[in-house]
Amino acid sequence: MINEKFSKIGFVLAMAGSAVGLGNAWKFPTMVGNNGGSAFIILYLLLTFAIAFVAFLAELSIGKLGESDIVSSLYKLAPKNKKAWSLSGFFMIGAILIASFYMVVIGWILKYIYLSFSPLLSDTKAAGEQFNTLLSNDLSSAVLCFSLVFLMVFFAVSKGVKSGIEKLNIWMMPSLFVLLVCMLFYALSMGDGFVKAAKFLFVPNFSAITPDVVLQALGLAFFSLSMGVGVIPTYAANLPEKTNLIKSTLSIILINILIGIMMGLVVFTFIFAYGADSTASGPGLIFISLVTLFAKLGVVGNVMAVAFFISLLFAGITSAVSMIEPFAYYLVRKFEISRKMALLYIGAFVYILGIFCILSYYSDTSSAFSVCGKPFFDALDFLTSNIMMPIGAIVFSFFVGYKLKKESLYLLFGDFMGRAFFEIWYFFLRYVVPVAICAIMIYQMAGK
């Protein structure tokens, strides 16, 4: 079976689409603002290029050298114990688990796009009740919106690499950027609010950098790039020949950082312009705090709300698509079935899990859909973010650093980096990255 190849720009935008997600709006800006401003950004950049960049190239090499799905690539490349190594490829199941609850959240965004065409709630308590109602009492809306997002994501993946995933990202990623630029221009007109947002994000406070903040930055740098669940090797298997792997990786990382900073400027301009809580984070920042601020602008606020939630929709869908593709690609190649048939199997599994996630927040069924005292939604989030992704990332990095021939890696990357730089990269891959990932995993587990 011949791989369907991305174009060079298609690969960069598809990988950037996977990396740019909802966390760029509600996690990255808050972490920057509350942990030293530009001091945190400098730390984040250093860790991204010292750790995440190294691990990203390692996963890229599995797909590029294996030229197949993650399971088959590991089997092909492993010098011995091929079956055992190929089984580690099933960490890609983590991707479809993530997709199941991630699409529920994108469904909330879809609901808020609809709500943004009507007068918005300016009272924080009322806005909070509106959001809580969607989660715990409005089952029909939650299921309908999740179902619509589910259909959009699976339709895009069903069209394949070129006609589906690449075309989606070539359209959505520039559109996301244009929407953010338009919102930034409006934010500039808000004077003092924009100045305070810029200071909040960019004025360095190095005294805020503690070991705890370093680990937060390390976790953000690492897992914002979709590592550990087979997305990178799967996309890399469809790379065109003679692609500059270093340049492509740098482009993906920089796009991810740029979108996060732009989101932060937009979000915190509104926060500071109206004196809202700058320490708010997570879904509450987006679905409660920002909604009340948009409401204060009247019709202009409605327009801004629609643009903002559409930008989040684009970011969410491109990420969700990347989570479905690895397992679909595996089923198509392994069992020689059609892409649509593979997606039928995956879709049934993902849809059921998504419904379970919705029911775990619904007031009448929450107790029946809990795991170890957590809502099923939260349990899936914990399993994938704190266990599957870190372990998968360690396994893939160890495989490349200790099981692949060093010269094979140099032949792959040598045209794009000098020997000295390659040796530094290889050292970091073998000795620094595994320790860093273990530190992240221990920190995240301890925090839970």
Which residues does each predicted region cover?
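Membrane-embedded translocation segments of transport machinery
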Residues: 2-5, 166, 170-317, 341-342
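Transmembrane helix-boundary motif of multi-pass solute transporters/channels
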Residues: 7-47, 236, 246-250, 254-255
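Membrane-interface "cap" regions at the ends of multi-pass membrane proteins
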Residues: 1-26, 55-60, 64-89, 240-244, ...
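Inter-helical loop and helix-membrane interface segments of multi-pass membrane transporters/permeases
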Residues: 3, 30-35, 65-90, 103-162, ...
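C-terminal membrane-solvent junction of multi-pass transporters and transport-like membrane proteins
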Residues: 87, 92, 335-347, 379-437
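Loop-to-transmembrane helix boundary motifs in multi-pass membrane proteins
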Residues: 10-12, 18, 143-144, 255-261, ...
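Helix-loop-helix connectors at the membrane interface of multi-pass transporters/channels
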Residues: 2, 72, 106-137, 236-242, ...
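Select transmembrane alpha-helical segments in multipass membrane proteins
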Residues: 6-15, 40-43, 82-96, 143-147, ...
